[in-house]
Amino acid sequence: MMPRNWKSVLSIAITSLLTSAGMPRLAVAQTRVSIGVTETMETYNPYGDSVALLYDLYSEVTGPFCSYNFATGEYEGRLAQRWEIKDPNTWVFYLDKRYTFNDGSPVTSADVVHSMSRVLAPDSKHTTLASPMLKAEAVDKYTVKLITKNPTAPLLDFICDRFIITSKAAYEKYGAADADRYHMLGGGPYARKEMVPGQRIVLVKRPDHHEAKKNPQAPDEIVFRPMREPEQRVTALLNNEIQIAQFIPPHLRKRVEASPHHKVVAADSLELMFLAMQPKPPFDKKEVRQAVCYAIDRDKIIATLLEGFATRLDGPIGPGQYGYDPNLQPRYGYNPQKAKQLLSQAGYPNGVDVELQTPVGRYTLDKQITEAMVPMLNAVGIRTRLATPEWPTLWANVQAGKVPFYYMGRGQVLDPSPPLHQYFRTGVTPRIGYSNPKVDEILFKEQEEFDPAKRKKYLAQAMSLITEEAPACFMWRHKLLWGISDKVDYQPPPDAGIFGLHIKVRR
C-alpha cells in the first residue's frame, strides 16, 4: 500500500531522461498522479491509432489545434488562436505564437502542413479527420489554410481535439519511426517522458508553458496505467496505487464509496454504445439486422446490470447532442415476437447461427452486458456464440472490417456528422462496411450545409434512414463513474477525456 506521504515518496528526477529527446531541462517533479485506464496505445506513431486515449494524450503533448469548451458550449482556440471561413472549401487558421515545441522551436504553419500530410497518408488511422480534407497550405509562418474536398460545415468537430500537430523538423531529421519513438516534440503543456505500449505512458509537465501556468496544482507527472479489469482498477485505487480510476462499473461503486479517502464521481457520457453488423450473411438482410434490434431488451439491461446509470438511445444520438430529434422514427422497442417474424421473412424460419465479439474491460460491463444479450438473441432464433478476443486483436480486426457482429462504442460525439460519415458513408472506413447511395447523398448535403436549421433537417433524415436500415443497433450512453482519491480534485468532462491541466493535486 502506498504511504500517506505519497507526494514526497513519489518525487522523481526527470532531467536526464528528457535531455535525450531534445527536451529542455526541467525541474524535479514534486507530484505524480497515476490513472488506471481501460485502453492503451499499441504504437508510437500518433497517427497510427485512433483510440480515445490517443487523442487525450496528444492533446496534452502536442497541444490540440483547437478545443471544445463544455462550460461555454463553444469551440475555442489553442494552437490555432482563431479562424475564419474564406469560402465553403477554405478555412484559414491563425496560429498562436506563444506555442513552442519542447526543444524551444516555434510551432509554425509548416508543421501543420506536415501533420496534415501524415493524417492523409495511406498508413494513417485518422480516417475520420482525413475524410473531408484535401490538403493544408501555408500562407505565412503563422497562417495556414485547411482546404476541404467539399464544403464541410462541421469541420471544427473533425479537427478540434483531434488534429495532432507534430514537428516537421524532427520528422525530417530522424525519420518517422525514430521521431515518433525517441524525439516526440510537441507544443502542449506536457511532454511524453516514457511510453511502453500496452504497459504505461508517462507525461511530464512543462512548467514554463503558458497553459501550465493556468493551473499551478496540475500534476508534475501523469502515469497512464492500462487496467482492463474493473476490479483491478478499484483495488489499485483503494490501495493508493492510482489516484484516478476510469469507468467504475455500478456494482463496484459501493466499495469505493465505503472508503473515507475516496469518492465516486459521475459524468454524463457522449459515447454511443451499439451493436454493429457487417452486411455479410446473415446480416446482409435488413430484416435480420432489425430482428437483432427488436431482440435486445435495453431497458432491462439498463435497469439491472447498469443500475440505471445509462440513457437509452432510440437512434444514433441522444439528448444534448447536436441535431437530436426526440421524435426520430423508427424505434425498436423490445419485441421478441416481431424479431422472430423478421427472421422468418429474411429466409431463416429455423433460426441462424452467429458470433458476437465483445471487448472485455474496455467499456462498462461490456462482457456482462453481451452475456445478457446472448439469451435474448437465442430466444428469437439468432443462436449466438460470444467471443472475447484481446482488445488489440479485436480493435485491429474491427478497423480492417473483419468482424461481422460486435459490441462497441464511439466516443466524444458532440456533432453526429463525424461518426455518421465514419461508420455509415460508403468507403470512409471498413468498420461496418455499410453502403447506401441515399444515405451518402444526404450525408454529403448535411456536411455542405452551413445553415444550422437546414443542416439539422438533413441530419434527421440521415439518422432516420440509418436507424431504419439498422447496420447498427443503438443501445445507450453510459453515465460513467470514476473513482477519485482525496489527494486530487477532478471532474471528468462529458467526453470522458483525461487531461492533466484539469486535475488539481491537493497540497
Region annotations inferred by a language model:
Residues 197, 344-412, 452, 480:
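Ligand/substrate-recognition segments at binding pockets and active sites
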Residues 69-74, 161-217, 221-223, 229-231, ...:
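Gly/Pro-rich hinge or "lid" segments in bacterial periplasmic/extracellular proteins
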Residues 208-255, 375, 383:
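Ligand-site clamp/hinge motif
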Residues 379-394, 421-486, 507:
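Extracytoplasmic/peripheral linker and loop segments enriched in polar/acidic and small residues
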